[in-house]
Amino acid sequence: MDELTRKVLNSFAHWRKETLDLHELFEAGGNDPDASTAVFDIVERLVKEGLLAEEGNDFYSLTEKGKGKLAADEHG
């Protein structure tokens, strides 16, 4: 898993929230406009892969599949 994808998935633990809006997820990219575009693309990909769920109004949650993928990545 690439570093930016890991940061996006770890955002839920960082903010200690079950759901995050897109602007909070953009924080994973810092202040770099190119990174914000990359975060947007990553979020779309993670939704398609079932790792994030769209909750409406630009809010997203980490699915059980996403939690498992993140845990597996952290353990090697």
Regions found by a protein language model. Give the residues of each.
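Amphipathic alpha-helical interaction segments
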Residues: 3, 7, 41, 61-64
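Short, low-complexity, charge-dense intrinsically disordered segments
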Residues: 73-76
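A short, conserved structural fragment
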Residues: 47-57
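Accessory beta->alpha helical hairpin/"wing" motif in late/C-terminal subdomains of nucleic-acid enzymes
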Residues: 57-69
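Short amphipathic alpha-helical interface segments
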Residues: 1-31
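Short amphipathic alpha-helical interaction segments
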Residues: 32-48
